[in-house]
């Protein structure tokens, strides 16, 4: 699986992953809205929005 692995507004980068899914986590703090992308489908704490998907580059 090929997943995006960049944060928020940094230039898009991808990674070839062993997992079959990609994720995109979104949350807000004093810096504003933070977006984190990567491989797999992690468990998240309350208040963090998580989107997991199962196709290449699906987590932008």
UniProtKB/Swiss-Prot annotation:
Gene3D superfamilies xref list: CD59 (2.10.60.10)
Keyword Magnesium assigned: no
UniProt main location, coarse: secreted
One Pfam family from the record: Toxin_cobra-type
Gene Ontology MF term list: acetylcholine receptor inhibitor activity; ion channel regulator activity; toxin activity
InterPro entries to which the protein is assigned, alphabetical: Snake_3FTx, Snake_toxin-like_sf, Snake_toxin_con_site, Toxin_cobra-type
Gene Ontology cellular-component annotations: extracellular region
Intracellular or extracellular location(s): Secreted
Top-rank lineage group of the source organism: Eukaryota
Disulfide-bond pairs as recorded: 3-22, 17-39, 41-52, 53-58
Tissue expression summary: Expressed by the venom gland.
The keyword Magnesium is annotated on this UniProt entry: no
Keywords, alphabetical: Acetylcholine receptor inhibiting toxin, Disulfide bond, Ion channel impairing toxin, Neurotoxin, Postsynaptic neurotoxin, Secreted, Toxin
Function as written in the Swiss-Prot or TrEMBL entry: Binds to muscle nicotinic acetylcholine receptor (nAChR) and inhibit acetylcholine from binding to the receptor, thereby impairing neuromuscular transmission.
Membership in a protein family: Belongs to the three-finger toxin family. Short-chain subfamily. Type I alpha-neurotoxin sub-subfamily.
Name listed for the protein in its UniProt record: Short neurotoxin 1
């Amino acid at each position: 699986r090929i997943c995006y692995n960049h944060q928020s507004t940094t230039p898009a980068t991808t990674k070839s992953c062993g997992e079959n899914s990609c994720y995109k986590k979104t949350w807000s703090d004093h810096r504003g809205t933070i977006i984190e992308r990567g491989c797999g489908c992690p468990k998240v704490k309350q208040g963090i929005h998580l989107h997991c998907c199962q196709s290449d580059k699906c987590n932008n």
